Amino acid sequence: MCRRKPDIMILTQIEAKEACDWLRATGFPQYAQLYEDLLFPIDISSVKREHDFLDRDAIEALCRRLNTLNKCAVMKLEISPHRKRSEDSDEDEPCAISGKWTFQRDSKRWSRLEEFDVFSSKLDPAPGAPAEAPLKTAASHESMLTELSERQEVASVLSLSSTGSLPVHAPHAGDAATPRTNSVISVCSSGHFVGNDDSFCSLPSPKELSSFSFSMKGQEKNAKSKTRSLLKRMESLKLRGSPHSKHKAPSKLGLIISGPILQEGMDEEKLKQLNCVEISALNGNRINVPAVRKRSVSNSTQTSSSSSQSETSSAVSTPSPVTRTRSLSACNKRVGMYLEGFDPFNQSTFNNVMEQNCKNRESYPEDTVFYIPEDHKPGTFPKALSNGSFPPSGNNSSVNWRTGSFHGPGHISLRRENSSDSPKELKRRNSSSSMSSRLSIYDNVPGSILYSSSGDLADLENEDIFPELDDILYHVKGMQRIVNQWSEKFSDEGDSDSALDSVSPCPSSPKQIHLDVDNDRATPSDLDSTGNSLNEPEEPSDIPERRDSGVGASLTRSNRHRLRWHSFQSSHRPSLNSVSLQINCQSVAQMNLLQKYSLLKLTALLEKYTPSNKHGFSWAVPKFMKRIKVPDYKDRNVFGVPLTVNVQRTGQPLPQSIQQAMRYLRNHCLDQVGLFRKSGVKSRIQALRQMNESAIDCVNYEGQSAYDVADMLKQYFRDLPEPLMTNKLSETFLQIYQCVPKDQRLQAMKAAIMLLPDENREVLQTLLYFLSDVTAAVKENQMTPTNLAVCLAPSLFHLNTLKRENSSPRVMQRKQSLGKPDQKDLNENLAATQGLAHMIAECKKLFQVPEEMSRCRNSYTEQELKPLTLEALGRLRNDESADYQHFLQDCVDSLFKEVKEKFKGWVSYSTSEQAELSYKKVSEGPPLRLWRSTIEVPAMPEEILKRLLKEQHLWDVDLLDSKVIEILDSQTEIYQYVQNSMAPHPARDYVVLRTWRTNLPKGACALLLTSVDHDRAPVVGVRVNVLLSRYLIEPCGSGKSKLTYMCRADLRGHMPEWYTKSFGHLCAAEVVKIRDSFSNQNTETKDTKSR
């Protein structure tokens, strides 16, 4: 019994320390600070009122920790203070979920924005315990809750909320006090108390408070020894699970959803700008669709419009077949309307739509057909078209010569027709234009078996629908051979790298020429999970098309290629209403806050539904936040390389060859039965692996077996050093599908995904979207989400590897001797399968900001940190007469101040690139470091400046498009450029104010960039916020220059941890690419002269 009490005390101290760690990790660091400052206990009810936007489970998880700290405060248990943040610390940026607290960077402490009493003279009673009277004060030194200490604790905390310097009065302090009281008195010695408990005198400001020190006097040495002994015992003791109070079952009342409500501020002018049309006011008229413009990489907030080309049969205005096909595909996929208040379940709406459809059918005669000239060359658009009535006999059917589709009588074979109401109107491809059925004839099915539009066998015995069927089949077979030869001729061409290119020279496969539609429905193999076409014309090449002359400096284009997969990006583009909720659009401060809320939500759910021995306080802090030394991967390029290393090398977490394998399967192999289920040939798979290791950027998969490529893709994820879900969180994912109820699993999964490292989350999103497209062709490949999960779950979760690592040799030997897995293994495999299948089915909802975050708008929306306008940049100087030119001059002065001080205070950072890399912490703004990379370039400063300004496409392999928005003066302009991202993630959009200087001392040049908000710059992706970007070019003799690049930017969708681990490597890689562009130019010039 004598030894049991110290053990209980040690365990309670461990719980207190881990409770403080949990509070910091979940967005409540202010309470951990109060406990370490010996200012507990606190009033739990006040905390609940302060966080009323949280749900019940999250509040209960918070209160459990606070009650633990209250108990420890009464027991006089102390923990070691949280270590102070140093300049080289990798600790997370302080972040509080509540918007009523702010972090004072000068004093490194939390303070309240308004007075709010969280202290009470009594503790909250335990659940089910009767209410007790307030604790009485005592004169003994052992008392922890004397009246004096309570009042002084309140005064000390309220002083944290002071934002200005206030007058200070001396107190009356003569009584003896405990160490806790002494520490409080030392802080509040300048405060004066009056008789009323609720009224206090003026209190010190946070700056004044930071100058005070807590005096421990005689207790200091004893406390240090206690701390050391505590830490030693914590290493040897394991946390014992403690039973938790049972929670009431959640309310079973269903969620009540009201009807559509018009948003505030949506006046008539706003509705007119959004092209909104009142449904009831249509009156049978069609909606005019605006004209299509030159295609660019567009964000989902923009609505692409349809083509406005002339619909006449003129040969001059008729586009090529590929152009027309692309236009139709783009229009039908992206043209949309935002109908505010539209009720799709209103019966009157259905009646109007049905009446409109009937009018559409009656507006076209059923005997209209378009004739193609006899000398028409297959594969090209006809030079002239004529329409008329069907002949009385013989030619009462028409064939689409490009696809082999046969149309029965009465079907209009051309999809763009003239209308009496609107001559230039675009008719939707999937609208009903005929009451008769459409039949398709293919050369790979028996001629006696024809399927009608509904999928049933056509009754050919009762009526001879096609009198010249043999001739038609003969022509179709010939056409198929020609089209195959035509597609093979251009199959090696790659994607276009321009963001404004809308068409390619030819489609990459016959499937992409035309999307078959049967009775207004696309075939499953041609649709992705969102209903968009999978076979839209793919950008032909992985090698960007040259936009230069091809001679001289244009020969220096980088040899590193980037995959252009625009169809994958466009098919999974979020809707207009959900674009702001996408994770990849959030700022770094919002991501930091979102991660802490996700940890809070996940902890609350797991503690509520999992057994007490399945979780503990130690679960709270994910291990990926800790610094881990990784081995060297110089001898590997693809397989076995961590995703973080891929980001540091190329800027993208997935290697280019793996992305190309996914694109090959998505474009050409979705009709293969049992894809990912049937095994490939080992020798061919090994050959594919060697191809990936040797040719990282460009691997040609043409002619490869779909099953070989799919197996190679599985092996890639299986060979990762740790599972895609990470070693720590894989077990958490399995617990979610073993213990959490079905209706709560989606919330738990969204929270767990936010705890993944950024590169793992991005790869998971890409993979899930890709697998959802595979399941969209389930009628052909027979692969449902569950079937795919059975095949891929072991590779993604590393189930077998985890079992071997977590099991002892004796246990593994016993399992092998029994020849069957135990029940735990079966449950984990089932949970992994169910989890992956659920993630595939709900992939679009997993990567969105939870709706609960909108309840704490004060703390979340303020963290967005949008770029400033030109006028706002001038106001940063607090000078009414200042403008953006004064801001730019200040930037130039600060740059040369760094140079004059020889970059004092910068910390060196190791990188695999051949450049010097260092960083410097910045106290203002978002939690982002300022990075600096330096390299020697074999060119003069003027040449380097020209390359940075005018020739970005020669060294930036991710560049999609660029243009100058506005020229402000001879050395200042607004510049916009777009960079590619790994599909299906949206492109990155930069709008910067840039200025350059060439008349600097010693022949140096400088280029400065800062993001701005400009009304003439359309949003064509995720808008990046460049806080600071500087290029300094100094001559160093022998025709060489020293290039120094400094950058601090918020790329959106990344945690602070990602910027610490990866962003610096990207800065170093950028200067290396700039240098290589000149090195390649010099090498090619020498080779030309030698010839």
UniProtKB/Swiss-Prot annotation:
Site (Arginine finger): R677
Region (Polybasic cluster (PBR)): 614-636
Cell compartments where the protein resides: Cytoplasm; Cell junction, Focal adhesion; Membrane
A Pfam family per the record: RhoGAP
Domain Rho-GAP: 641-847
GO MF annotations in UniProt: GTPase activator activity; lipid binding
InterPro entries: Rho_GTPase_activation_prot, RhoGAP_dom, SAM, SAM/pointed_sf, START-like_dom_sf, START_lipid-bd_dom
Keywords for this protein: Cell junction, Cytoplasm, GTPase activation, Membrane, Phosphoprotein, Tumor suppressor
Biased segments, Basic and acidic residues type: 414-425, 513-523
Region entry Focal adhesion-targeting (FAT), spans: 273-447
GO cellular component terms attached to this protein's record: cytoplasm; focal adhesion; membrane raft
GO biological process: actin cytoskeleton organization; regulation of Rho protein signal transduction; signal transduction
Sites of Phosphoserine modification: S86, S89, S320
Predominant subcellular localization, coarse grouping: cytoplasm
Residue ranges constituting the START domain according to the UniProt record: 877-1084
Ranges of biased composition (kind: Polar residues): 499-511, 526-535
Start and end residues of each SAM domain: 11-78
Domain notes: The SAM domain mediates interaction with EF1A1, and functions as an autoinhibitory regulator of RhoGAP Activity. The polybasic cluster is required for activation and mediates binding to phosphatidylinositol-4,5-bisphosphate (PI(4,5)P(2)) containing membranes.
Assembly information from the UniProt record: Interacts with EF1A1, facilitates EF1A1 distribution to the membrane periphery and ruffles upon growth factor stimulation and suppresses cell migration. Interacts with tensin TNS1 (via N-terminus); the interaction is decreased by phosphorylation of TNS1. Interacts with TNS3 and PTEN; in resting cells, interacts with TNS3 (via C2 tensin-type domain) but, following growth factor stimulation, TNS3 and PTEN are phosphorylated which leads to weakened interaction with TNS3 and enhanced interaction with PTEN.
Entry protein name: Rho GTPase-activating protein 7
The species this protein was found in: Canis lupus familiaris
Gene from which this protein is expressed: DLC1
